[in-house]
Amino acid sequence: MTPAKFERSLSKSKPPAGLMPALAALWWAGKDDWDKAHKLVMDEGGADCAWVHAYLHRVEGDLDNAGYWYRRARRKPAQGDLQAEWTAIAATLLAANAP
């Protein structure tokens, strides 16, 4: 799936089938459903989920907690626009998980 198609899927009521937890959480974040997104990543152990988890805490303004999750994801804390970060995470995760 391309990042553009992933973003267009936000017009639907459910995420595309078969998304890994990090992408499903990012999808719900794109729908402004922070709680659903957070539930999908809060108990996952991988770096991809940690990256989305960091993004979610950045969205809520909890930069200390976001910093913890960026470190767990082995990523530098984002500084710019939240939408730009959402797009960058989506593009990276989609590329890494392409068939």
Which residue ranges define each predicted feature?
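Residue-level signature for tetratricopeptide repeat
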Residues: 26-27, 55-57, 93
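Helix-turn-helix repeat elements of alpha-solenoid scaffolds
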Residues: 26-34
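Inward-facing hydrophobic residues that define packing positions of alpha-helical scaffold repeats
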Residues: 7, 22, 34, 41-42, ...
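TPR/TPR-like (Sel1-like) alpha-helical repeat modules
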Residues: 45-47, 59-80
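Terminal, low-structured helical/coil segments at or just beyond the last alpha-helical repeat
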Residues: 82-99
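Generic helix N-cap/helix-start motif at coil->alpha-helix transitions
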Residues: 15-21, 45-50
